[in-house]
Design a protein with these regions (language model features):
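Iron-sulfur cluster-binding electron-transfer modules in prokaryotic oxidoreductases
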Residues: 1-153
């Protein structure tokens, strides 16, 4: 986005992105193992109309969603499921969207929202790439033709 190759839609344009709040879940792989913390937030910050609300536990000190420890394939026998606890932390921010950059975390957070029931309301979990893609301005000059079955356009 900084180089101008990706352009966001005008937030005042009806096709643009409406103002919304989101919180970002740092995946263990990106944040703790690779130190990728600021970059996803920079991408989200470049999306018009986005207000980022941090969870108490974030960055290198973030709280695992449970996928990294293989908990997505296990049932907890005691206590609260890890993804339910992380989802609760995200909901506590009051954000409308929980963003993440890890497909496994996304599954865990979506399951956590489903389990949260009414408390989750209309909160959704989305990948950073989905949020960015939805904000991009259409560039008709760059669109590829649609091919129809039988070779026609």
């Amino acid at each position: 986005m900084e180089g101008g190759r990706l352009r966001s839609a005008d937030p005042g344009d009806p096709a643009g992105v409406a103002t919304r709040t989101l919180t970002y879940h740092d995946s263990c792989y990106l944040a703790r193992y690779n130190g990728v913390i600021a970059e996803p937030r920079a991408v989200l910050g470049a999306v018009p109309g986005v207000e980022l609300r941090e969870m108490d536990k974030n960055g290198r000190g973030g709280f695992c969603c449970g996928a990294g420890g293989g908990r997505m394939w296990m049932e907890e026998t005691r206590g609260t499921r890890i993804n339910a606890e992380r989802t609760r932390q995200a909901l506590d921010t009051g954000a409308e969207t929980i963003a993440t950059a890890c497909p496994f975390c996304l599954v865990m957070l979506k399951d956590g929202l489903a389990d949260a029931g009414e408390r989750a309301g209309s909160v959704q979990a989305q990948d950073v790439a989905e949020i960015l893609a939805a904000s991009l301005a259409a560039r008709p000059e760059r669109q590829l033709p649609v091919l129809r079955p039988g070779g026609g356009r």
